[in-house]
């Protein structure tokens, strides 16, 4: 298994249930967050701390992970070199358990591979029956000409990550990567788009300025990679969208 995100770790755990040996290759360190903290979903715990300043919230989150998991080195995994929040954490309850029980074997970055034979950067070589790459997604819109829209290698100049500054009837729904769940945000974006289509919501006149403001002032400062161009703070983005919708048009949050 190549990758350290949610999909890679989930697939590594699942394949380890039926395979004789499963290895997972990370090219950098990731923070692994449990799905449940203190008996509650980790995103709910994060939401309950949202009234705190971001730096303090990140510090407490980092300390909580260290207390619950210990250091990555204890599991043979690379330690994260970035600050908390600069990259997306991985949410998984079983990976560290499987590593400790010898079901998943951590490996470093890959130097090269020839067929099913993989040579790692530490000089070790292993042969695998199946190699699965979960190395992320490219932001792509193949149905558009590249000179029209191509956000694969650049920042995304869209107001609320959905409105183009020139084309009023073009909407991007769900093209954001929150530090939290994407579905409630996508729902609100869809509702806002519906109101724009029916004329119940009017685009701001300074939308070009607002698009550039989102690019220059992102919610979260992260490392400069194509993956991190659409990151939003879940709670802040939720508030921004809700302000533009009638109160009776917004779904109520479930109580946990």
Predicted regions, residues:
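Flavin (primarily FAD) cofactor-binding/catalytic cores of flavoenzymes
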Residues: 1-36, 50-54, 58-203, 208, ...
């Amino acid at each position: 298994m190549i990758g350290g995100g949610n999909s890679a770790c989930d697939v590594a755990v699942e394949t380890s249930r039926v395979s004789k040996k499963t290895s997972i290759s990370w090219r950098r360190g990731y923070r692994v967050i449990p799905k449940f903290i203190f008996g509650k979903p980790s995103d709910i715990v994060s939401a309950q701390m949202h009234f705190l300043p971001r730096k303090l919230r990140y510090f407490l989150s980092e300390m909580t992970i260290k207390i619950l998991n210990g250091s990555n080195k204890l599991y043979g995994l690379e330690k994260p070199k970035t600050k908390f929040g600069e990259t997306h954490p991985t949410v998984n309850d079983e990976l560290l358990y499987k590593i400790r029980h010898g079901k998943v074997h951590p490996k470093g970055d890959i130097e090269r591979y020839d067929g099913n034979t993989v040579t790692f950067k530490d000089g070790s070589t292993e042969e695998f029956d199946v190699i699965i790459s979960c190395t992320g997604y490219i932001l792509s819109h193949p149905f558009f000409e590249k000179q029209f829209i191509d956000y694969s290698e650049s920042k995304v100049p869209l107001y609320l990550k959905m409105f183009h500054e020139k084309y009023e009837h073009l909407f991007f729904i769900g093209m954001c990567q929150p530090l939290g769940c994407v579905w409630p945000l996508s729902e609100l974006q869809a509702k806002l788009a519906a109101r724009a289509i029916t004329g119940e919501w009017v685009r701001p006149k300074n939308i070009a300025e607002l698009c550039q403001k989102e690019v220059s002032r992102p919610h979260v400062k992260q490392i400069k990679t194509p993956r991190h161009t659409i990151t939003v703070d879940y709670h802040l983005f939720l508030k921004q969208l809700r302000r533009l919708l009638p109160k009776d048009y917004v779904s109520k949050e479930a109580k946990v």
